């Protein structure tokens, strides 16, 4: 059966055979074990046990069980044929070369080889550890059987490893060494011969050893052959390189690979003697730290504790925890985490051991101490590769042996190489990519460095710095910026030393720079201390390794029996060898001095004993050694004596005498020993003895000064005559240098001692004397001697007589003493010169001569730099030079700090600096910058990974930070120098500020990229900020300042070309002082930006943070004065004269000047800027485009800042202008969204208007001066746009205040009357302060402002549009109301028409609106409206008017001739024009056009009884229904762009009045009811809402009377009834109202409608007219049913005449009694617990004021007819109203509910559907009435259809009290899942206030009809008064709220329905802004 083959898998072309990978897995497991063992092995002795277990596990792995893991010898011993057995195995295990890189072919041999080799080394390391840690003697330990066995195991491992790789020369050497330890000389010799005969053919030529291992092996073989005396073998050609050459000493010490093992093959065997030595107990001398210093201190402690005992002492070294060095080899291929391109055996580590196998001799110990440390050995270059065909195995494994295939073998390989192996091929490419990456990382840094140093070089050269050394140093740095090896270009020695101190950081060396700054000691002792050492090379010497050779010394001492005396002598003798060659550490020097002082006697005795036993050979080494020892001890004791005799020493006299004795004793001993030698003139020991002798003579008390001086002169002469070189004693402070120059310094010190004694006297407090003494010594170039005129004339030969004294440099006439001082200072060290400069600077500081003090600091810096370049420094050895460098670097740091402090904080620092001084100082600072730059380069390279970072320590980090701080201070100080230089040479630098700014920016970039700006407390950033703020003429200063502010405070300016970079600086808090300094620059930047852009930029955040730092301005008396005057001015009435005076700049306020810290920013407009930001925030969202009211907080904040600005600068017109804008915007916010404030809080609106107008007046007045000459005042708004905006907005404010809804109220001030004194007499009279401004004056002034605005903005159509409107209003003003002047200049019709046509011309010139935008229609509509009104007024002929309109762009037939004859044609033409404009209004924004159309069709002033009026009204109604009113009477009026805030509510009021009038004429009671319901819910949307509501209600009531023909009852129908009879009649009328006979009764229907409108009114207006209607309806009903009532009564009751006792109700008659009781009970029950159905639905916003609700109609209707408390004989009107309500409720219940049982109630769930009740509304009678039970099925259907609308339910429930006959109404409303329920008594009574307001009663439940037969119930908390004025409260539990919306509204979508919510929000009105609107003639009557 064929195998399955997937058709969607392509078969491979080359299918490799399956390979068994079991062996590979086993090899990988073994390698893991090997790596684990290797890791444990490398961890040191503490892991040796674990490493042993790991190696055991390794050798138990499967690979060591393979046949190929056995050696040839093992196979031979096993009886196998090596050749036949091996070939097939290796054929299977080793695939073709190059094919299996990581497989068994390469990994297995390597694993076997390395496992055995490293295990053998591990065994040797364990032996080494045992030897080190053992307290027994070495020989018995190494003869132990276990050690011998371990060594044999190591030898076996080495043999197996060599069987795998016989080319390992180093392994052959180790094998030979182990064999020598095991006393196998034959194996030793064989192994050494194998090591050097690997691949060399001796028959060809003599060859050199190719590696260091072979060289060592050859040298060892030569020594062994020499021991054996095998001269024949030494003649072999391969031995020639070793026989004829010697191994260098520094390599010979590394020749023995295992020096801890004894080597018996080094000498011929001798018979061993029996060891009979008996171990004796010795004292132990423990050492805590293995160092010479600790050993000396331990000796002193031992003597102090044990005394000078004679017991033997054993020195015990500490058990160090540090890991011992282990030798191991790891093939790089076995470490996948570190892939390497190299193959083969890596270089092996050669271990250096001081100890040797045999007990070291004392000479060996000394040799180990004195010999220089050997440099790291580097293997010599290997020979060229041999012939590949050579059958001899090469030492380096070939490519094939390593398993790496050639390029041509890849295709032929059977198995593809692994990814790890293939990555080796791309190593070179990766290195190249890495180099490119590093170069890209360095490129920005190098570019910044190059820019900075090139800028510095250019500036220095231009300033005249010609020092080639300085320029060369800068050139070095520039060259390094472009080089790969940047530090390789640096040649300066000081820079190299600094680089070395970083790369080889030492904590002790770094502590010099990191230590706290110590003030210089300006005393004589300090001077003497610094004067002891002269040459800078005195400290030359390499540092002594405190632990080198100590182990050998301890082993040597412990081998014999040595007391503490012997140990101390040997200790001193061993260290004296290094006295002149190495610089001892301070601890070691102290230890040696302590040992020589405490055991001086023992050392002296030991020395004398050794001197006595030594051979008296004058040229022997022993005598020379003893002479050096004696002289060294002499010098050490002399040094101790010098310190004891120091004036500051606290040693007692006994100590001084003892020290003197020691000096004398060792001086004698040294002299005696030296005399035993053959003396040479240049013998160093002799020179040292002579110098020490003279020094001791100098120290001796009582020695004459002349004698001492002669001794030094003699010594100097001797040194001059001898050929001796300079001798440096680095460990002696008394005589550190022996040379002619040092002798000269000592002589100079003696000769100048008097001068320095006077200089450093403790009581010398005269700084002037110090200046006069030191200035000639330190600065002779600046000191001149005044020569009298006579002497000057004599010198000149008398040719030029002059009376002026001359000046001569002091260098030309110096005295011998001064010359000696100069000579002394020239040879002195740097510390002394710095000390003197410091003394001079301190003296200048005391006399407050800052500039000279600053000069001293700079000279000190120059001194340090010159010393770093001196020959003494350059030719010093490394260690002392580097120590000296750190000391000078510390001094340099202190000097730079002091200099920078004076340069930045004292303006007089540079007063006396001449050009030469300036150039030299700048040159020195440039050198310092170049030197310190190496630290920055080092950090760059370590940061990006170019160089390995040193071990990170806190001290190193602190050291680098210190260098960073020095660099920052140096650049800062250099800037101050350059600034002075540039300002002194204006001819060379025409724009010095730009050059300085570029330099600062270059430094900032260099520091910022390295995150160094924060160094030195951000001193550079602070300096740069101050400098940038000072400089005025910098290009792109915002870029420089922006980065500085971001680094300092985290502020972003958001301007400029560059983006700010993160320089790693922690932002600081911005202080007030700093913020005030920034105000000028920040304000300048803000002025460059528009406010809209400013609000989006980072600069706004910066300004806010600055203001937070500045804080609020503290009030001052001056500020309070100004603010008080401003406040009083804003409250004052508007004076007409001030308006016209403002046009000429004559209005001003009384203000005083304010001088506070905030005055400076105020003058720069800071507070104005803050106010503008706050104002622009509010203006950011256009008023008319916001959907919700805006927060006025920003407005108030802006006004506050603007007022503050005006307190400081009262003449800023723009601040007044923006303050006026704030008032304007707050006014607009008050009237834009609601009409509440217009209706109730008009005083606040008047205040806003007056404040704005007053502010505009001040802005207009102060702008006059600015407009005349803009340079007079400094204005932030330097363009004229704001000025013309001010003209326009001022005009708009004036015009708006003159029109409704403000209606000239701001200009009326009748309430502000004052008393005036009569002209004649003493009386007074009261009148207003000045005349009020008329509306004509307002329009005239506004037109003038708009004309001024047109000058600046000719393309703004609003200005000419408003001019036209003003002219039209002025034209409409009746001439009789104007004065004579205004009547003469009253605008004409042509002027009005021209103004309108000008507006249309401007609009037509504007660009066409974009697609989807409507054109500007306001001017086009306005000219149609105005022309029509002119025609209607008769001021313009019809044809002329038509001609005018026909020429307009939007005429129906533009340009055509039309003929209009009469008024009808004219109206038709105007209507055509309006319709054409409406077609252009796609968005239906222009509601004025619609209303103008309707007004043309129907005039609301016409008589409604006219038949034509009804038709006209219907036509107008149809026009309005098209786009303004919906069928549910929802008015959709949108606020257009050109409509002023507040006008919308005026228009809505006018439109509602017009619609009410139209509906009244049409007798459309249903629509009128809907209109009333709409306006009742939205009282806040209508201006004069209370009057509007009263107007609508009265119209509706009148319409009800006319519709249902309800007569006005003049006579009360109930005047003949008593109260009881009235109650009985009321019950019967209520019962009759539910019968079918009552359905067609018009009075009943009218009464229901009246009750509903009364509920809707909810006491908003006086209910008199409504009550009259209800009373009349009830009376009509009574009169209608009265006959039936009488007939029924006569049938039931006997007739009794009036007054008959039997006419009274019979109490025994149960029916009569029950009727009466029922009426009384239900009435009382209703009063107590049942809320009336007439409750208030008035919303919070619709609550009228009490006084307003009591007003009568404003339409001129008569007040309700007067009535007494009772109707007729005893029936009060409230009782009639209550009975009428009961009747209406009965009708509603009968119409809405099916019959139900009295005892229970149902939810309507029975019957399968929810039956929803109907409460009757006015709409029930729309069809003329409907029977209560008619159409019950239809009602049920309607209930189901409208159930989702959350209507109310009314249900019959049983009486809670259990009484019969009582019913209560349960009103339910579903709210989501729940139901809110309330109960009301069925026979509830309703009491309404009488016309006189005697009392009010009734719950405020407003049931509004919704759709057909629907009713809405709104919840309203209320409190009613019972009759008689007694309040009657009803519980809130019975009040139920519902939505106020109709079903039609839900269908039309005009209003959203939200069940259970509060009263609905006002109708959505789309509002737009910022323009004007047209006014109609009809507005005048408002």
Swiss-Prot record:
Residues 348-365, 1832-1847, 1885-1896, 1907-1953, 1965-1982 have a biased composition (Acidic residues). GO terms for molecular function: nucleosome binding. It comes from the Eukaryota. InterPro entries: Hir3/CABIN1 (IPR033053). Coiled coil: none annotated. Keywords: Chromosome partition, Nucleus, Transcription, Transcription regulation. Residues 1688-1705, 1743-1754, 1897-1906 have a biased composition (Basic and acidic residues). Residues 1755-1765 have a biased composition (Low complexity). One of its GO terms (cellular component) is HIR complex. Residues 1801-1810 have a biased composition (Gly residues). Residues 377-393, 1706-1715, 1732-1742 have a biased composition (Polar residues). It is found in: Nucleus. Residues 333-427, 1688-1776, 1791-1982 are annotated as: Disordered. One of its GO terms (biological process) is chromatin organization. Has a role in a nucleosome assembly pathway that is required for the integrity of heterochromatin and proper chromosome segregation. Belongs to the HIR3 family. This is Histone transcription regulator 3 homolog. It comes from Chaetomium globosum (strain ATCC 6205 / CBS 148.51 / DSM 1962 / NBRC 6347 / NRRL 1970) (Soil fungus).
């Amino acid at each position: 059966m064929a195998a399955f083959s997937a058709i969607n898998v392509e078969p491979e072309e080359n299918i490799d055979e399956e390979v068994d990978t079991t062996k590979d897995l086993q090899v990988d497991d073994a390698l893991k074990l090997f790596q684990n063992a290797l890791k444990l092995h490398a961890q040191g002795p503490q892991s040796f046990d674990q490493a042993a277990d790991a190696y055991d596990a390794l050798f138990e792995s499967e690979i060591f069980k393979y046949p190929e893991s056995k050696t040839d010898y093992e196979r031979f011993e096993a009886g196998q044929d090596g050749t036949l057995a091996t070939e097939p195995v290796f054929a299977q295990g080793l695939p073709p070369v190059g094919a299996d890189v990581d497989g068994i072919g390469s990994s297995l041999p390597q694993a076997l080889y390395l496992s055995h080799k490293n295990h053998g080394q591990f065994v040797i390391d364990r032996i080494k550890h045992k030897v080190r840690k053992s307290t027994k003697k070495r020989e018995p330990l190494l003869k132990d059987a276990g050690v011998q066995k371990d060594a044999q195991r190591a030898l076996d491992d080495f043999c197996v490893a060599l069987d795998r790789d016989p080319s390992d020369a180093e392994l052959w050497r180790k094998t030979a060494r182990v064999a020598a330890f095991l006393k196998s000389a034959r194996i030793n010799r064989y192994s050494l011969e194998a090591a050097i005969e690997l691949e060399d053919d001796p028959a060809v030529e003599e060859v050199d050893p190719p590696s260091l291992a072979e060289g060592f092996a050859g040298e060892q073989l030569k020594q062994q052959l020499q021991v054996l005396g095998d001269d024949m073998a030494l003649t072999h050609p391969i031995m020639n390189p070793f026989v004829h050459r010697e191994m260098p000493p520094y390599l010979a010490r590394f020749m023995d690979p295992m020096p801890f093992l004894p080597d018996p093959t080094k000498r011929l065997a001798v018979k061993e003697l029996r060891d009979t030595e008996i171990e004796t107990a010795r004292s132990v001398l423990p050492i805590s730290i293995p160092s010479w210093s600790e050993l000396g201190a331990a000796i002193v402690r031992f003597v102090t504790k044990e005394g000078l005992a004679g017991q033997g002492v054993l020195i015990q070294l500490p058990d160090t925890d540090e890991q011992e060095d282990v030798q191991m080899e790891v093939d790089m291929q076995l470490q996948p985490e570190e892939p390497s391109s190299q193959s083969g055996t890596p270089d092996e580590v050669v271990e250096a051991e001081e100890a040797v196998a045999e007990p070291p001799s004392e000479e060996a110990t000394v040799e180990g101490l004195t010999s220089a440390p050997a440099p790291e050995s580097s293997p010599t270059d290997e020979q060229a590769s041999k012939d590949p065909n050579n059958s001899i195995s090469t030492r380096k494994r070939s490519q094939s042996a390593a398993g790496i295939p050639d390029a041509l073998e890849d295709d032929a390989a059977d198995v593809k190489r692994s990814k790890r192996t293939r990555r080796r091929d791309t190593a070179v490419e990766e290195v190249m990519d890495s180099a490119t990456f590093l170069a890209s990382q360095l490129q920005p840094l190098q570019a910044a460095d190059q820019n900075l140093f090139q800028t510095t070089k250019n500036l220095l050269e231009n300033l005249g710095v010609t020092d080639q050394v300085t320029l060369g140093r800068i050139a070095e740095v520039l060259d390094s910026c472009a080089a790969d090896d940047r530090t390789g270009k640096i040649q300066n020695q000081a820079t190299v030393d600094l680089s070395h101190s970083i790369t080889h950081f030492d904590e002790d060396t770094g502590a010099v720079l990191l230590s706290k700054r110590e003030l210089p000691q300006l005393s004589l002792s300090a001077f003497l201390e610094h004067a002891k050492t002269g040459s800078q090379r005195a400290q030359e010497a390499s540092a002594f390794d405190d632990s080198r050779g100590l182990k050998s010394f301890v082993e040597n001492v412990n081998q014999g029996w040595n007391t503490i005396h012997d140990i101390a002598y040997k200790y001193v003798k061993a260290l004296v060898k290094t006295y002149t060659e190495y610089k001892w550490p301070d601890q070691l020097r102290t230890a040696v001095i302590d040992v020589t002082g405490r055991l001086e006697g023992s050392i002296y005795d030991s020395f004398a004993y050794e001197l006595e036993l030594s051979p008296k050979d004058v040229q022997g080494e022993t005598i020379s050694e003893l002479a050096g020892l004696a002289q060294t001890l002499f010098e050490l004791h002399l040094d101790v004596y010098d310190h004891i005799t120091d004036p500051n020493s606290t040693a007692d006299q006994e100590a001084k005498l003892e020290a003197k004795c020691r000096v004398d004793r060792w001086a004698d001993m040294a002299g005696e020993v030296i005399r035993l030698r053959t003396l040479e003139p240049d013998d160093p020991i002799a020179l040292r003895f002579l110098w020490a002798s003279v020094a001791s003579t100098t120290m001796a008390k009582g020695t004459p000064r002349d004698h001492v001086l002669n001794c030094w002169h003699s010594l100097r002469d001797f040194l001059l005559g001898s050929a001796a070189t300079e001798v440096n004693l680095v460990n002696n402070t008394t005589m550190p240098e022996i040379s002619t120059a040092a002798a000269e310094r000592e002589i100079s010190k003696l000769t100048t001692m008097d001068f320095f004694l006077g200089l450093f006297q403790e009581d010398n407090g005269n700084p002037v004397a110090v200046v006069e003494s030191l200035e000639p010594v330190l600065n002779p170039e600046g000191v001149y001697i005044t020569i009298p005129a006579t002497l000057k004339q004599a010198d000149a030969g008398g040719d030029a007589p002059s009376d002026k004294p001359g000046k001569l440099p002091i260098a030309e006439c110096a005295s011998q003493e001064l010359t000696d001082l100069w000579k002394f200072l020239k040879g002195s060290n740097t510390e002394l010169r710095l000390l003197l400069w410091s003394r001079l600077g301190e003296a200048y500081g005391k006399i407050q001569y800052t500039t000279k003090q600053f000069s001293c600091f700079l000279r000190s810096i120059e001194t340090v730099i010159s010393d770093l370049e001196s020959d003494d420094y350059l030719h010093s050895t490394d260690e002392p030079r580097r120590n000296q460098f750190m000391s000078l670097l510390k001094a340099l740091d202190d000097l730079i700090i002091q200099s920078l402090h004076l340069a930045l904080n004292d303006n007089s620092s540079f007063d006396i600096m001449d050009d030469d001084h300036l150039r030299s100082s700048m040159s020195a600072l440039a050198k310092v910058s170049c030197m310190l730059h190496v630290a920055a380069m080092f950090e760059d390279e370590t940061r990006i990974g170019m160089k390995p970072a040193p071990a990170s320590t806190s001290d190193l980090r602190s050291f680098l930070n210190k260098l960073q701080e020095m660099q920052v201070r140096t650049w800062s100080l250099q800037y101050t120098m350059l600034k002075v230089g540039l300002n002194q040479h204006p001819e060379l630098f025409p724009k010095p500020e730009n050059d300085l700014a570029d330099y600062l920016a270059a430094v900032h970039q260099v520091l910022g990229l390295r995150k160094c700006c924060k160094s030195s407390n951000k001193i550079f950033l602070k300096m740069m900020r101050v400098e940038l703020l000072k400089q005025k003429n910098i290009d792109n200063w915002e870029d420089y300042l922006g980065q500085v502010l971001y680094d300092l405070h985290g502020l972003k300016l958001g301007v400029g070309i560059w983006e700010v970079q993160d320089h790693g600086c922690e932002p600081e808090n911005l202080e007030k002082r700093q913020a005030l300094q920034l105000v000028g620059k920040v304000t300048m930047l803000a002025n460059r930006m528009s406010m809209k852009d400013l609000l989006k930029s980072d600069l706004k955040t910066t300004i806010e943070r600055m203001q937070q730092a500045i804080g609020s301005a503290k009030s001052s008396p001056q500020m309070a004065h100004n603010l008080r005057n401003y406040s009083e001015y804003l409250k004052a009435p508007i004076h007409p004269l001030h308006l016209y005076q403002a046009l000429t700049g004559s209005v001003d306020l009384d203000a005083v000047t304010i001088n506070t810290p905030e005055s400076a920013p105020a003058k720069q407009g800071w507070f104005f800027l803050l106010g503008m930001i706050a104002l622009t925030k509010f203006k950011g969202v256009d008023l008319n485009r916001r959907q919700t009211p805006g927060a006025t907080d920003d407005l108030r904040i802006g006004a506050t800042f603007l007022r503050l600005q005006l307190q400081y600068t009262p003449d800023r017109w723009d601040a007044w202008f923006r303050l006026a804008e704030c008032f304007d915007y707050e006014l607009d916010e008050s009237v834009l969204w609601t009409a509440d404030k217009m209706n109730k809080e008009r005083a606040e609106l008047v205040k806003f208007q007056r404040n704005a107008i007053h502010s505009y007046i001040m802005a207009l007045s102060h702008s006059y001066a600015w407009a005349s000459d803009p340079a007079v005042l400094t204005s932030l708004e330097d363009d004229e746009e704001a000025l013309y905006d001010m003209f326009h907005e001022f005009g708009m404010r004036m015009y708006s205040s003159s029109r409704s809804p403000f209606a000239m109220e701001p200009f009326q001030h009748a309430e502000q009357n004052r008393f005036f004194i009569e002209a004649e007499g003493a009386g007074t009279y009261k009148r207003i302060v000045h005349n009020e401004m008329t509306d004509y004056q307002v329009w005239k002034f506004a037109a003038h402002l708009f004309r001024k605005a047109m000058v600046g903005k000719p393309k703004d159509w609003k200005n000419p549009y408003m001019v036209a409107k003003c002219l039209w209003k002025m034209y409409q003003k009746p001439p009789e109301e104007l004065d004579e002047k205004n009547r003469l200049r009253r605008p004409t019709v042509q002027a009005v028409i021209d103004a309108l046509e000008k507006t249309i011309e401007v609009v037509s010139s504007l660009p066409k609106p974009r697609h989807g935008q409507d054109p500007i229609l306001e001017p086009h509509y306005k000219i149609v409206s105005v022309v029509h009104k002119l025609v209607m007024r008769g001021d313009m002929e019809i044809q002329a008017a038509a001609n005018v309109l026909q020429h307009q762009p939007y005429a129906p037939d533009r340009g055509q001739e039309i003929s209009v004859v009469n008024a009808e044609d004219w109206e038709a033409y105007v209507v055509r024009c309006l319709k054409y404009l409406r077609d252009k209004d796609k968005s239906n924004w222009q509601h004025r056009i619609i209303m103008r159309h309707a007004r043309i069709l129907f005039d609301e002033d016409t008589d409604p009884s006219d038949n034509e009026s009804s038709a006209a009204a219907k036509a107008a109604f149809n026009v309005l229904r098209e786009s303004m009113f919906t069928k549910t009477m929802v008015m959709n009026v949108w606020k257009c762009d050109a409509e002023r805030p507040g006008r919308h509510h005026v228009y809505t009021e006018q439109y509602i009045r017009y619609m009410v009038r139209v509906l009244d004429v049409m007798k459309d009671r249903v629509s009128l009811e809907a209109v009333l319901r709409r306006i009742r819910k939205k009282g806040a949307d209508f201006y004069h809402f209370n009057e509007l509501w009263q107007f609508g209600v009265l119209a509706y009531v009148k319409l009800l009377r006319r519709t249902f023909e309800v007569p006005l009852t003049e006579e009360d129908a109930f005047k003949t009834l008593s109260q009881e009879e009235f109650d009985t009649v009321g019950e019967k009328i209520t019962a009759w109202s539910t019968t079918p006979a009552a359905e067609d009764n018009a009075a009943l229907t009218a009464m229901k409608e009246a009750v509903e409108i009364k509920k809707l009114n909810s006491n908003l207006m006086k209910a008199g007219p409504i009550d009259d209607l209800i009373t009349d309806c009830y009376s009509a009903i009574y009169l209608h049913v009265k006959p039936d009532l009488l007939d029924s009564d006569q049938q039931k009751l006997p007739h009794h005449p009036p007054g008959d006792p039997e006419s009274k109700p019979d109490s025994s008659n149960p029916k009569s009694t029950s009727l009466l009781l029922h009426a009384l009970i239900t009435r009382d029950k209703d009063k107590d617990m049942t809320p009336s159905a007439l409750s208030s639905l008035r919303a919070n916003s619709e609550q009228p004021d009490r006084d307003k609700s009591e007003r009568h109609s404003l339409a001129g209707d008569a007040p309700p007819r007067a009535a007494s408390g009772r109707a007729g004989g005893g029936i009060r009107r409230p009782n009639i109203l209550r009975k009428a309500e009961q009747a209406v409720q009965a009708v509603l219940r009968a119409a809405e509910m099916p019959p139900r049982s009295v005892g229970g109630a149902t939810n309507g769930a029975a019957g399968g559907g929810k039956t929803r009740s109907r409460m009757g509304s006015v709409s029930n009678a729309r069809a003329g009435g409907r029977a209560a039970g008619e159409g019950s099925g239809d009602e049920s259907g309607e209930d189901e259809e409208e159930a989702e609308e959350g209507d109310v339910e009314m249900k019959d429930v049983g009486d809670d009290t259990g009484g019969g006959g009582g019913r209560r109404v349960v009103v339910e409303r579903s709210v989501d899942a729940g139901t809110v329920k309330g109960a009301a008594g069925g026979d509830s009574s309703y009491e309404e206030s009488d016309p006189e307001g005697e009392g009010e009663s009734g719950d405020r439940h407003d049931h509004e009809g919704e759709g057909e037969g629907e009713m809405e119930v709104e919840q309203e908390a209320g409190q009613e008064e019972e009759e008689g004025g007694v309040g009657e409260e009803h519980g809130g539990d019975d009040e139920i709220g519902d939505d106020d919306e109709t079903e039609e509204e839900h269908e039309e979508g005009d209003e959203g329905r939200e069940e259970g919510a509060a009263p609905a929000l006002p109708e959505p009105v789309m509002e737009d802004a910022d323009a004007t609107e047209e006014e109609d003639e009809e507005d005048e009557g408002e």
